[in-house]
Amino acid sequence: MGIIGAGHVGSTVAFILATQGICQEIIIKDLNLDTARGIALDMGHAASATKTHTIVRVANEPSDLRGCDVVVFCAGSPRQPGMSRDDLLLANAKVIRTVLSEVKPYIQESVLVMVSNPLDAMVYTAIKESGLSPLQVLGMAGILDSARMASFIFEKLGYGSDQIVASVMGGHGDDMVPLPRYSNVAGVPITELLEPQEIEEIIHRTRNAGAEIVGYLKKGSAYFAPAKSTAIMVEAILKNSHQVFPCSVLLQGEYGYSDVVGGVPVKLGSRGVCEIIELELLHEERERFDQSIQSVKSLIDALYHHAFFVSSRP
């Protein structure tokens, strides 16, 4: 598998995959070759220490990514304090265009996992720029947001950390849609375990978790949880597990939307998206989901407004 961008998230994804022996070979591509070489060498030592025998090497040329089953795209500018994901829109869209123009001839058989923010708009951009089927391009967000929600549920309850299932849909931003009704502890809905005010606090912290971390770090943003969430996706794809995870994908009629990306439950396999699962949403849940998708649509519209894409919007 390949990793584009050897910053905090990309290198941590590589570390997790290498030390768990999830893949045979990891190829790291970064603008700074020396940085990539140093990380690859260090990572290879870590793999050896854990007896996984995963090979970690550097992509000296774009063609070195040929044959990768999965390519994780982490390149781009991170969020800084006071910066929203939306501020990153044009800058990171240009990064995606530049990098994919170099590597796309060699990744046509790969599944492309996007991590760069603003996530949903970057997934859309990658679909447009890569030439891949929309089923081969998906974004890592829902697993991360659900993990954050599960962590906050555990903070409130104080038990059942390994039995908590949290569900978050919609865009990866301030309008994401945590779903308490689909969140449970060993099958018991959290609506039966927590007071409404406690659930609202969990929803608020889930939506603002990324910004909260940025505020504490001052420089940079979260990377441990995003990297682990990405590694979970990669493992499911490589193992053709058909496990269901919330992922950001292009909607083509699902939930009544087309030509827009949103986070929804997806069955993952070796070719990417096997199936998009449509949940039944109550009226209030549906309204929040619609609002979230409209926020993503406004970002995509902004890219068209700035004439980023050659073609007009379908």
Curated annotation (Swiss-Prot):
<keyword id="KW-0520">NAD</keyword>
<dbReference type="Pfam" id="PF00056">
    <property type="entry name" value="Ldh_1_N"/>
</dbReference>
<feature type="binding site">
    <location>
        <position position="85"/>
    </location>
    <ligand>
        <name>substrate</name>
    </ligand>
</feature>
<dbReference type="InterPro" id="IPR011275">
    <property type="entry name" value="Malate_DH_type3"/>
</dbReference>
<dbReference type="GO" id="GO:0004459">
    <property type="term" value="F:L-lactate dehydrogenase activity"/>
</dbReference>
<feature type="binding site">
    <location>
        <position position="92"/>
    </location>
    <ligand>
        <name>NAD(+)</name>
    </ligand>
</feature>
<dbReference type="GO" id="GO:0006089">
    <property type="term" value="P:lactate metabolic process"/>
</dbReference>
<keyword id="KW-0816">Tricarboxylic acid cycle</keyword>
<protein>
    <recommendedName>
        <fullName>Malate dehydrogenase</fullName>
        <ecNumber>1.1.1.37</ecNumber>
    </recommendedName>
</protein>
<feature type="binding site">
    <location>
        <begin position="5"/>
        <end position="10"/>
    </location>
    <ligand>
        <name>NAD(+)</name>
    </ligand>
</feature>
<keyword id="KW-0560">Oxidoreductase</keyword>
<comment type="function">
    <text>Catalyzes the reversible oxidation of malate to oxaloacetate.</text>
</comment>
<dbReference type="Pfam" id="PF02866">
    <property type="entry name" value="Ldh_1_C"/>
</dbReference>
<feature type="binding site">
    <location>
        <position position="79"/>
    </location>
    <ligand>
        <name>substrate</name>
    </ligand>
</feature>
<dbReference type="GO" id="GO:0030060">
    <property type="term" value="F:L-malate dehydrogenase (NAD+) activity"/>
</dbReference>
<dbReference type="InterPro" id="IPR015955">
    <property type="entry name" value="Lactate_DH/Glyco_Ohase_4_C"/>
</dbReference>
<feature type="binding site">
    <location>
        <position position="148"/>
    </location>
    <ligand>
        <name>substrate</name>
    </ligand>
</feature>
<dbReference type="InterPro" id="IPR001236">
    <property type="entry name" value="Lactate/malate_DH_N"/>
</dbReference>
<feature type="active site" description="Proton acceptor">
    <location>
        <position position="172"/>
    </location>
</feature>
<dbReference type="InterPro" id="IPR001557">
    <property type="entry name" value="L-lactate/malate_DH"/>
</dbReference>
<feature type="binding site">
    <location>
        <begin position="115"/>
        <end position="117"/>
    </location>
    <ligand>
        <name>NAD(+)</name>
    </ligand>
</feature>
<dbReference type="InterPro" id="IPR022383">
    <property type="entry name" value="Lactate/malate_DH_C"/>
</dbReference>
<dbReference type="GO" id="GO:0006099">
    <property type="term" value="P:tricarboxylic acid cycle"/>
</dbReference>
<comment type="similarity">
    <text>Belongs to the LDH/MDH superfamily. MDH type 3 family.</text>
</comment>
<feature type="binding site">
    <location>
        <position position="117"/>
    </location>
    <ligand>
        <name>substrate</name>
    </ligand>
</feature>
<dbReference type="InterPro" id="IPR036291">
    <property type="entry name" value="NAD(P)-bd_dom_sf"/>
</dbReference>
<feature type="binding site">
    <location>
        <position position="30"/>
    </location>
    <ligand>
        <name>NAD(+)</name>
    </ligand>
</feature>
